[in-house]
Amino acid sequence: MQNRILTLGAAVAMLAAGLCSCSEKETEVATYENNYEQTLVQDDSASVQISHSIQYYKSYEGGRALRRKINDAIVRSCFGEEYVGLKVEEASDAVSDTLIANYQKDAGESYDEYLAYSKNNGNDYDWTPATFCNWYYRTVGAFGEKFMNLQTYQVFSESYTGGAHGMYYSIPYIIDINNGEIVTENDLFLPGYVAPVTGLIKEELESEQGSDTFETMFQDGMVPNGKCGVSGEGVTWFYQPYEIASYAEGIIKVTVPWAELKPYLNSECLKL
């Protein structure tokens, strides 16, 4: 029962609409889906569930070398720097193996501590520490909007590893489809951009949220935070739970139009 259970099997290829050619001369998007579950050694009523759904390029009109570089950027965005060089499915398996090993160690230790505490305090009611040891991790990576040579790749992740509630994040990455490199916020803007762009972000937030709500938010966090994506409209910053508002407010997005950002953009990265 302790062996890893592969619940969905291998990759499921989902072709992009209207694309049917398998030629490297055309672009084909696929989605790799993987689901794992493993029970806790101490109690098989507790388990960890791991789910990955990752879009990547199966073929790319820019050629194989560029496709590999873009897919490396996707692996880095979804799984981390240490997995670059692996295919999406290989990275998914490697990450899952690590998470499962960590679960057995960390959740196992928590289980033993909960159980010892319960016994030491004479708890005789029907309670099991397995309640806090049902963990999960989910990662979804998908192509977002695109502007000129810049492609937004959106990574949503959520997890529960014990405690009152889980956590979730939605983080965009910008990939230059001309060279496969990840474009950071510092690449996108000229030096000295932080102060003026902070002002633009606050103006947009106050306009969208309303003055009363805006005043209750965490003003110190309303800065360019490096978690931004691009679209035809402008640059969108994503603020995670607790970053500029309470957990209940969730993920907050704010878009600043290109026209307002133009004086601060790095023309070597993006020419408007």
Give the location of each predicted region.
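Bacterial N-terminal signal peptides that target proteins for export
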Residues: 1-9
